[in-house]
A protein has these predicted regions:
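Short, well-ordered alpha-helical microsegments
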Residues: 41, 112-113, 139-140, 163-167
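Proline-aspartate-enriched helix->loop->beta-strand connector
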Residues: 150-155, 160, 176
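Short glycine-rich anion-binding loops that position phosphate/pyrophosphate groups of nucleotides
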Residues: 36-40, 158-163, 185
Length: 237
């Protein structure tokens, strides 16, 4: 697992946003993985996720505070979190500023429809060229259809590891575009769910807020974060 930490973007959030905007301006193709402990745990058991993390073309950013803490325990200088939902928000802002195009893929039908309505209102210069909920059967065909539209931004909200695999396996179909797997961000961006209060965000305890709101997350948290911590402690520094 230690090799994964060598792949983490470590220039800080401001530099990342500058590079993100420049990529959007210049029509580069970029695949951003928002890594948390669960991502790295999947990488240990899933060959595709392993390849995604280690692929030098993939931009791996430290989404979870567990990744930041573990990085520093292992001697890597990771400055701060770069949350996936904040990346999605920045892309909406930059896309609006630069009059770019976007495609939304994922979440429940009512959620993505509400998101589209909100984005049209809040980001009038950002052109939505399509959207699809996450409950369609042939997702690769949807990606093929999206590639023909050639959007500047593609946000995929299917949850790990499905969103990362889908993007990675279909990336060659696209000539340009910024691709990000954003998990449950559509729920928050659409207004269907509230993000954690600022005190949780500031103290890097959004994970705790999610568990309080959804206790069923405890098992998932244990299987990813707690087991991840045990693995990190066994790694030679």
């Amino acid at each position: 697992m230690k090799k994964y930490f060598e792949r983490i973007y470590n220039k800080g959030i401001d530099s990342f946003y500058d590079e993100l905007k420049e990529s959007l301006k210049s029509n580069k193709k970029s695949f951003i993985v928002t890594a948390n402990p669960e991502t790295f745990m999947y990488g240990e058991k899933d060959e595709v996720i392993n390849n995604i993390i280690l692929d030098k073309k993939t931009i791996v950013v430290p989404d979870g505070i567990g990744i930041v803490k573990a990085s520093n325990m292992l001697g890597y200088n990771i400055k701060e979190r770069i949350p996936g939902i904040d990346i999605a928000t920045k892309l909406l802002e930059y896309g609006n500023e630069l009059s770019k195009t976007i495609y939304f893929f994922g979440a429940k039908k009512e959620v993505v429809e509400k998101l589209v309505e909100k984005v049209k209102k809040d980001y009038p210069n950002l052109k939505i060229i399509g959207y699809t909920d996450g409950y369609v059967t042939n997702k690769d065909q949807i990606m093929d259809n999206i590639s023909k539209l050639s959007p500047d931004i593609v946000l995929v909200a299917l949850g790990i590891p499905y969103q990362e695999k889908l993007i990675y396996n279909n990336l060659d179909k696209f000539e340009k575009g910024i691709f990000v797997g954003v998990g449950g961000s559509f729920d928050v961006l659409s207004g269907c769910k509230k993000r954690a209060p600022k005190i949780f965000i500031k103290t890097n305890t959004e994970w705790l807020y999610r568990i309080i709101k959804e206790p069923k997350r405890i098992k998932r948290f244990y299987n990813s974060n707690v087991k991840f911590l045990f693995k990190i402690k066994k790694i030679d520094k």
